Amino acid sequence: FTNIKTRAIIDLTVTGHWITVCRNGGNGFTGVVGGCNGDGITFNANLSETELRKLPYGGVWNAQMRLKTLEQWEWEKIGDVVTNIRLNVRSEPSISVPNSTVKLPVTITGHSEPVTVDTCLFDGTGAGDSSRYELRLDDLSGAARGNMFALKNVTKPDAHPLYYTVSAGTPGTNGDKTVWTPGLSKVFTGMDKVPIAGTMATGGKVVPCVQWPLTLKLQSFNPVRQAMGQYQGQINLVFTPSLNMP
């Protein structure tokens, strides 16, 4: 089987069953003897779940099965039965965040340097078959404001939050980053043309993925007026690829 996008090749074993018009039959595709007077043989082919699991990732995989038919006794070739097989394979989309817990450094002046969070997006095929990505960043603190995400005081939840922004560009590119608004979806088209430069583990396999780094920047604050303590926040990344398969 050949992936039409990546040209990767994987060998899978096709199993099957045959039966003649005389109702005799058997398993496999070799040694089929007994066309009898009706001269008709029906072949049923299938791929087991075990074989399908050998595919390294999703996408469209093509193969051609050719059965040679011979006339009994003389063993002269009658012809070939050619079957084109196409598998449209898709796994569940997934997101990899290798370092999902980050710290935003704070100085005594209330300023902070940006921190990058690396993420990688697996569209369910790993072959770039999704032309459209929809992405959304949700702030789970419940205290987001405008285009700012919030960090809440762990021991004093009613204290004034610290705020930070999240910036990101088009996945898979080095384009300019823009500040995202919590809970607001963005749609990116032409994603089947961007480089698939990353890898991630999902479902026991290593699959290709599209890199999408996020930049977190803590907003300036007055340390004198800010309640002391540890501040925490959480972002939920929602990724919805659309799959275009022929």
How should these model regions be labeled?
Residues 1-46, 141-223:
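Signature of Gram-negative chaperone-usher
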Residues 44-169, 212-234, 238-246:
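N-terminal small/polar-rich segments of proteins
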